[in-house]
């Protein structure tokens, strides 16, 4: 956020100069830090090393080295395949059975009872009181796309056109069956609210790619179905310093409130006031060593720079008409298509983690028309983003992720499907991912993931590996525990998480 001042600048400068003088005199009277300040400094630990990532490049004496990082992980554990992530979050839980996971057996069983051997003792959300669970066959036909012949729903023809660039993961699983906790688990790797989001972890580990824009940006859109709310804690930094939390850009109007100066305030005067305030903050921080003061300093500086960088970012007047046609976007309409175009522009300018939420996939009823309607909002733009990045030579170091917080049941819920956590689908492209292939499988009904099962922790470990980070070496100490995105170090993660999905599983690799 940007703080604007409308008072007399000469008066403000005089008062601030006096405050700085007083604090300097106070500082000189302190011969040593007291015990509390010392302990505060110790408790910051490794985290404090990353706090200066917004104030300028750190340790970039070998900028040509692929292992150099501006964040807490420096040097990186591996040579990175990806430099940035664009996460296209299909909020609401898209049905894998109408999009990415073809199940002819389920079509044959349409209207017949689901075998109890599959569902007994399983979490089935709102269907648990039904006396008889009946199969609901796929409501859309599938077709082979590309040279790879990947089977993708006809509801997603444009995503089908990039079949040779994407890897479809058909064996995702999660642990939470309701929307908000499922988003929390997918974003943080924990069922407990208040943990850092994966975007915050990535920004903490790698640092910012630009000094003029936030390192973690969130955009949202809706259309096609029931709009489930998305809580802002999904992009929160948790116990990491708050400078690593995501910045939510508004899809219409000014993306950030107060980005423009009010009448009577100019950039030069505002810059002088911010510099004076930050000088006071820096003096204070020498005494208390508080990471949140560093955050405040960086936020003031970032807000000031964003007054120039953000208007340039959202000014799409120089984008050619064929680019709007490619995405199906209209300037300023706040659509998923416009957000995808903005995501590419953010990626070009160095934003590390870009997260786009599209709400509208919660099809408890009318799944056939619902999927088709929602798909029309996202299909063209999702494919356009991959094509655009590829044409610009950016796809090779940009990881694009597409998927929701869970899938949908193969059993009918009226004319729709209920929430499902035992097996669903994602796709990934770029950033070192092998395209034109699928990974894992569910059973014949699309109920249980049975081949190369992927947990959320496996998923996170793979993302980190592509970024050059070994997940079990990437920790942050909080309340005496070494936390990581893939869980507290003492907790179990599956064997696949040790190396991410790149480990040999069934003789196949996706990275």
PLM-predicted stretches and their roles:
Residues 15-17, 386, 505-506, 511:
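Extended rod-forming repeat segments used as scaffolds/tethers
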Residues 11-12, 28, 59, 63-64, ...:
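Intrinsic disorder/low-complexity segments enriched in polar/small residues
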Residues 23-494:
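Ligand-binding pockets and gating/stacking loops
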Residues 9, 15, 37, 410, ...:
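Small/flexible residues
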Residues 492-511:
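Single conserved hydrophobic/aromatic residue that forms the stacking wall/gate
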Residues 10, 21, 280, 500-501:
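Short intrinsically disordered, low-complexity segments
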Residues 2-34:
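N-terminal secretory signal peptides
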């Amino acid at each position: 956020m940007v703080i604007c001042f409308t008072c007399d600048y000469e008066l403000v400068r005089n008062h601030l100069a006096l405050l700085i003088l007083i604090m300097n005199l106070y500082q000189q009277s302190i011969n040593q830090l007291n015990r509390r300040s010392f302990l505060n400094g110790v408790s910051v630990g490794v985290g404090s090393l990353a706090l200066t990532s917004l104030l300028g490049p750190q340790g970039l004496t070998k900028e040509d080295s692929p292992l150099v990082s501006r964040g807490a992980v420096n040097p990186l554990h591996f040579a990175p395949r990806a430099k940035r992530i664009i996460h296209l979050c299909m909020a609401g839980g898209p049905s894998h059975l109408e999009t990415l996971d073809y199940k002819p057996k389920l079509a044959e069983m349409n209207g017949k009872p689901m075998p109890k051997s599959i569902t007994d003792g399983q979490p089935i959300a709102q269907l648990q009181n039904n006396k008889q669970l009946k199969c609901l066959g796929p409501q859309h036909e599938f077709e082979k796309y590309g040279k790879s012949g990947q089977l993708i729903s006809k509801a997603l023809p444009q995503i089908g056109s990039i079949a040779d660039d994407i890897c479809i993961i058909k064996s995702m699983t999660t642990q939470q069956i309701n929307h908000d906790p499922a988003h929390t688990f997918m974003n943080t790797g924990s069922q407990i609210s208040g943990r850092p989001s994966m975007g915050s972890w990535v920004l903490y580990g790698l640092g910012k790619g630009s000094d003029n824009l936030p390192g973690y940006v969130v955009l949202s859109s809706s259309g096609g179905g029931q709009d489930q709310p998305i809580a802002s804690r999904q992009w929160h930094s948790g116990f990491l310093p708050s400078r690593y939390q995501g910045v939510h850009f508004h899809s219409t109007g000014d993306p950030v409130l107060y980005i423009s100066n009010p009448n009577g305030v100019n950039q030069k005067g505002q810059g002088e006031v911010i510099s004076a305030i930050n000088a006071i903050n820096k003096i204070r921080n020498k005494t208390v060593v508080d990471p949140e003061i560093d955050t405040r300093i960086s936020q003031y500086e970032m807000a000031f720079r964003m007054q120039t960088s953000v208007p340039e970012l959202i000014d799409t007047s120089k984008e050619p008409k064929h680019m709007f046609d490619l995405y199906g976007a209209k300037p300023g309409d706040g659509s998923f298509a416009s957000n995808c175009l903005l995501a590419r522009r953010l990626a070009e300018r160095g934003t590390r983690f870009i997260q786009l939420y599209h709400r509208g996939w919660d099809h408890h009823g009318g799944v056939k028309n619902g999927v088709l309607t929602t798909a029309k909002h996202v299909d063209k733009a999702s494919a356009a983003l991959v094509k655009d990045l590829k044409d610009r030579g950016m796809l090779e170091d940009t990881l694009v992720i597409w998927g929701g917080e869970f899938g949908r049941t193969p059993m009918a819920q009226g004319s729709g499907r209920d929430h499902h956590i035992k097996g669903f689908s994602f796709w990934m492209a770029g950033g070192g991912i092998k395209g034109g292939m699928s990974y894992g499988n569910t059973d014949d009904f699309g109920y249980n993931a049975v081949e190369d099962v992927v947990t959320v922790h496996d998923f996170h470990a793979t993302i980190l590996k592509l970024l050059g980070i070994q997940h079990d070496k990437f920790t942050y100490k909080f309340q005496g525990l070494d936390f990581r995105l893939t869980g507290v170090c003492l907790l179990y993660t599956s064997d696949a998480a040790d190396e991410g999905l790149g480990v040999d599983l069934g003789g196949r690799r996706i990275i």
